């Protein structure tokens, strides 16, 4: 197993649709690894993680806007392609960052974060 630190763009990180948080959901279905990167699966996974009105990640959104990204708590990933990685640990943080990136792209306030953070 490959270990170490990598730096990649947020767009290269795929949320895990088989996250243990989803198993008890009535609308949960197991997703095969070769389908994880599909847009509709990633959108559904992001919706699961965000919750209604972003209630599941609002604390992280506010923390990132105030404190930026804390380097001492890296997101753990598994390589599943040349430049794609599935998030193993840190799906909520990744979801919050993806939402903040979307806000940045629409010229909304993202606090202390900068384009390079995405």
Language model features with spans:
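Short, charged/polar connector segments at secondary-structure boundaries
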Residues: 1-116
């Amino acid at each position: 197993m490959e270990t170490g630190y990598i730096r990649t763009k947020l767009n290269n990180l795929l949320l895990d649709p088989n996250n243990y948080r989803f198993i008890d959901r009535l609308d949960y279905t197991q997703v095969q690894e070769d389908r994880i990167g599909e847009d509709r699966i990633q959108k559904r996974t992001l919706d699961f993680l965000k919750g209604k009105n972003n209630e599941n990640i609002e604390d992280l959104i506010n923390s990132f806007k105030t404190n930026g990204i804390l380097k001492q708590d890296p997101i753990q990933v598994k390589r599943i392609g040349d430049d794609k990685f599935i998030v193993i640990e840190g799906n909520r943080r990744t979801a919050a960052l993806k939402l903040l990136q979307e806000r940045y792209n629409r010229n909304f306030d993202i606090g202390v974060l900068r384009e390079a953070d995405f």
